[in-house]
């Protein structure tokens, strides 16, 4: 069975679009590890990856990924109307719709996700640093927040599951 045969068509498309934009599941798993390692000393990257995969299986997450990436690509291609074109190109701080889309992911596993998201959005470790680099000419206004939100949701899922096994 190929990698994509194990996923729904939507999930496979969302994963493929992230990969096209330079984001691997392992990148997001590293963010989960960054968020959770001090709370779970025996945590492994495999556990983090499992939780990322579970988050990616959610339809609302797939919808957010596909929508956000499409808007980022259209902004790169300069196919949006003003003032939206400029707001996305410069990642206008008062725009906020990118965060609203990310919150739809963060909220899946409860309020702990918001704390995780706020922290990782501020620190911008790993892949988030690259996605926020405006010098590349790429637009990741939505994708950086979506990746942060997926890591926050996966961290929340991990925390909830760990709590029930103690």
From Swiss-Prot:
Q: Specify the superkingdom.
A: Bacteria
Pfam families the UniProt entry points to: PgpA (PF04608)
Please name the InterPro entries in this protein's record.
PgpA-like_sf (IPR036681), Put_PGPase (IPR026038), YutG/PgpA (IPR007686)
Q: A GO term (biological process) for this protein?
A: lipid metabolic process
Q: List the disulfide bonds.
A: none
Query: GO molecular-function annotation terms?
Result: phosphatidylglycerophosphatase activity
Which positions carry the signal peptide feature in this UniProt record? none
Under SUPFAM superfamilies, the record lists: YutG-like
Family, similarity comment: To B.subtilis YpjQ.
What's the name of the protein?
A: Uncharacterized protein YutG
The uppermost taxa in this organism's lineage are: Bacteria, Bacillati, Bacillota, Bacilli, Bacillales
Gene expressing this chain:
yutG
């Amino acid at each position: 069975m190929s990698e994509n045969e194990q996923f729904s068509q939507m999930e496979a498309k969302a994963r493929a679009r992230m990969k096209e934009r330079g984001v691997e599941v392992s990148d997001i798993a590293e963010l989960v590890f960054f968020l959770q390692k001090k709370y779970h000393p025996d945590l492994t990257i495999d556990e983090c990856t499992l939780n990322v995969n579970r988050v990616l299986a959610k339809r609302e997450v797939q919808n957010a990924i596909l929508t956000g990436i499409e808007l980022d690509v259209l902004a790169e291609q300069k196919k949006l109307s003003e003032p939206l074109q400029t707001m996305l190109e410069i990642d206008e701080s008062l725009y906020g719709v990118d965060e609203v889309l990310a919150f739809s992911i963060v909220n899946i596993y409860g309020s702990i996700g918001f704390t995780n998201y706020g922290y990782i959005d501020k620190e911008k470790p790993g892949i988030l640093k690259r996605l926020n680099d405006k010098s590349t000419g790429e637009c990741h206004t939505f994708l950086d927040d979506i990746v942060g939100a997926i890591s926050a949701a996966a961290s929340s899922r991990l925390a909830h599951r760990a709590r029930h096994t103690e």
